[in-house]
C-alpha cells in the first residue's frame, strides 16, 4: 500500500444531507489535504502525565492528530500506549495536562460526553443481541427514528461486509465477523474520532491481514480521524499515516511509516521497528567508524571522533557482491555463513564479518537470488554494507 504524508478529509455535505444522530452518506468523496500543517489539529494531547502511585505511566506527552489522519500508537507492553488511549476516551483521568478535541477542552468530560467511537480487542458485543441489535444500540439510545435506524444499520453492515448476516448472534459469528460488527457499532453515530484498542490481536494471521486492509480502506473512504493502539509493527507500517513509537511512558519518535523505518532516531526505535543489525564501534573521523578491524564509511554520522557508537543496518539493505568490481566498493567485507533460515519469499543468512567475528549479523536475500547463489551449500561470501544505509548512534551507558 502507499504510505501517504497527507490526511484524508471528507467533503462537507450540504445541510439537506445531514440528519441528527445519523451519518452523512457513506459514498461521500474523500480528498487529501494539500498540507496538514496548515490545519488546526483535531485532537491535541497537551502535557499529559499519568501516575499510578509512584509509578509514572505517561511522562509529559505532547501530540497533535490532524483531521482525517490515521495515527498508530506503537510500543512494547507497558509503554503507556493503552493508558494514553484510555485518557483520550475519558476512561482514565490524567494526573496533569489537557486533551482537546475539535478545539474543545474535553479533559474532564466523562466518556458519554465525548465524541468518539471505540473498538476493543475483545469485541465487547452484547451476546444476547443480534448483529443488527448491537449496531443499532447507540442509535436507539439517541432516540433516532426507527426507519432511519434500519437504513443506517443496513448501510453499516453492508459497509463492513456483513450484509445479510445481521440476524446472527455473536456466538454464531467468527472472530473477524464479530470485530466487523464492533466496528460498525463504533461508527453508527458518526463520531468525530475513532479509537481502536488492538482490534486485530485476537484474530488469526490471515484474518488479521485481510481485516487490517479493510479497516484502512474504510478509514480512508470516510475520512474519520483515527487513533489505534498496537504492538504489531506490521499493522502500524501497513495502516498508519503516522506512527507514534512509545517507550517507558514517553514518545520516542513520531513520523510516517517510511521515515520511522528508514530513519530511526534511537537504537530503541531501530530495534523495535523491523529487524536491525547492530555493531559496536568508535568514530575515527567525521564519516568513518571503526568496528573491530573494519573501517566503515558512514556519511550520515553526526557523532564526534573518538566517541563510542553503535551502527545500525537492516538485513535487507546489505548487498551481496558476486564478482570483483573494477572500481573500489566502499564498505566491502568478507563474511562467513554460520546458518540460514528459510522465510518463504527469501532467506535470512547469519554471518560473521572478517575483522569483527564477535558480533554476528543477518543478511536477507530473495529466494531467487538464494537459489542462484546455491545458498544451501554456501559457506562464505563477500558483502557490502552500503554507506548511505548505515545509521550511527552514540553508545548508551548500560
Predicted feature residues:
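Non-catalytic connector elements of ABC transporters
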Residues: 2-26, 31, 276, 287-398
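ABC ATPase nucleotide-binding domains
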Residues: 70, 109-268
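The feature captures the beta-strand-to-loop junction immediately N-terminal to the Walker
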Residues: 74-76
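Conserved ABC transporter NBD signature motif
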Residues: 97-105
